[in-house]
């Protein structure tokens, strides 16, 4: 299972918390290549914003509204979604925006010091496996079946993530969350590394081998 809440819903000794297997190429990213791809350097930490394939109007607006302040201390990679590019920001030092990234994504993950993301199960498990401090902004209950909210709250309870409800996302709340998570980043990193999510495939294989021996 992926969440401890799921284990509690199943018969005793019938479920094991393993985390979700992730794409192995994500674990082989090169931070230097990620910085080079974006035209960044190692002088400032990097925030990676992932708004999903369609992007999030609320998240995009909040990020861009605090960009001048963010760029004093951070560099920002913004995956803003299809048709969500802001041409007026092209050429802004320390900021790059893309509708979507595929092949270079492992390198961008490796370069990131903090990630802002939606809370789909696959996305958050990838973030956890990489032990990247993160802020999760789940789809609202009005725009989804509510699963992202449950995912995000579970990760928050386990100490892996900071959660902002989409309805509360604005310049002030986002900037405050970024400062809080970055200042306490090692606490989040330690919690994720202890979770075992960094080697979900290995844990699942071990369970299968154990069952074969019985």
List each language-model region with its residue ranges.
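Donor-nucleotide binding loops and adjacent catalytic segments primarily
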Residues: 31-33, 40-114, 149-151, 157, ...
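A short, well-ordered alpha-helix in the C-terminal region of glycosyltransferases
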Residues: 186-198
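Acidic donor-binding loop of glycosyltransferase active sites
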Residues: 98, 110-125, 132-133
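Active-site-proximal region of nucleotide-activated glycan assembly enzymes
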Residues: 1-32
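Short acidic/histidine- and often glycine-rich active-site loop of Leloir-type glycosyltransferases
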Residues: 126-129, 145-158
């Amino acid at each position: 299972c992926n969440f401890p809440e799921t284990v509690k819903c199943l018969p005793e000794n019938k479920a094991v918390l393993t985390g979700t297997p992730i794409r192995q190429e994500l674990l082989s990213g090169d931070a230097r290549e990620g910085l080079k791809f974006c035209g960044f350097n190692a002088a400032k930490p990097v925030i990676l914003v992932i708004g999903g394939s369609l992007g999030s109007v609320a998240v995009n607006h909040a990020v861009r509204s605090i960009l001048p302040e963010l760029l004093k201390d951070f560099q920002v990679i913004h995956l803003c979604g299809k048709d969500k590019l802001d041409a007026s920001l092209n050429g802004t030092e320390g900021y790059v925006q893309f509708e979507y990234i595929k092949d270079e994504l492992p390198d961008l993950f490796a370069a990131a010091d903090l990630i802002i993301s939606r809370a789909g199960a696959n996305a958050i498990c990838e973030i956890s496996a990489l032990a990247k401090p993160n802020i999760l902004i789940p789809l609202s209950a009005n725009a989804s079946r509510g699963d992202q909210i449950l995912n995000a709250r579970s990760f928050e309870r386990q100490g892996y993530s900071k959660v902002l409800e989409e309805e509360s996302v604005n310049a002030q709340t986002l900037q405050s969350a970024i400062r809080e998570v970055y200042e306490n980043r090692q606490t989040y990193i330690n919690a994720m590394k202890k979770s075992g999510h960094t080697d979900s495939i290995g844990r699942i294989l071990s369970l299968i081998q154990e069952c074969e021996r019985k």
